[in-house]
Amino acid sequence: EKYGTGSGGSRLISGSHILFAKLEQALAEFKSTEKALVFNTGYMANVGTISALTNNNDYIISDELNHASIIDGCRLSKAKTLIYRHKNMTDLENILKNLPYSHTKLIVTDSVFSMDGDIAPLDEIAYLAHKYNALTMVDDAHATGVLGKGHGSVEHFHLQGKIDIQLGTLSKALASEGGFVAGKKILIEYLINKARSYIFSTALTPADIASSLEALSLIANDNSLVDKLYDNISYVQDLLQQNNIDINLTTPIVPIIVHSNEKALQIAQKLYEKHIILSAIRPPTVPQNQSRLRLAISASHTQEDLHF
């Protein structure tokens, strides 16, 4: 009754309201940054930010397994994009040392990789960025509500103030809709005026923003949810070992590689018939012959849920 069901326009016209301001302030505090900016999706946050910050005179250095939204942002930016082998810091340094020191260089990485659940060595990336005068950008889509005490990869690696750009989503741990960017005030003010995916999109609904704000408050003020999540991760790790499945879990993403597309689909269908949703991930999302079942553990799962 107070805010209506829709936003009525883009953020720069009539779509902003006090709930946006409250959520963006809360996100900035949650990520230990000066300001934050909400986008309609995580995809739009990545595409809009990367394409706004770089052009054909600049360099982007990107992990080979980064999310499609990062890849598309690199393409739209027209920057010279150089790919380093997955989490390989020797390869990253070899690329950086051969680039002009004074040119704009942006190192971009997922923090938790969506298909394997492994964690980027953000501390080493930050060190190399400082050494070679590069900016750093981390996508915390799968780390917010997971790493550290729930605040994400920067907290996990104790890098507050040392990562230039933090991105995240409101649709995973926060169970709402949207994405966000957090960083210095000058960064956010620049994106407000330059990020086309922000400028030319109707704003999120008040219900989306209000639910995100409440969910963020729960994570920020109650560590028990993150503790329960890691209890569940440990429980699943034990179950996998008991069944001779050798996977070392560090996050809630559990990839069970079956190689064959058909086998992945068949297993997923049989599980679905037993009321278990386990996604069959196939090319082009993963490489050929790397089809898998991806289990996503949450704090809301009971041991009975997980012991299927």
Role assignments for model-derived ranges:
Residues 155-190:
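Active-site PLP attachment segment
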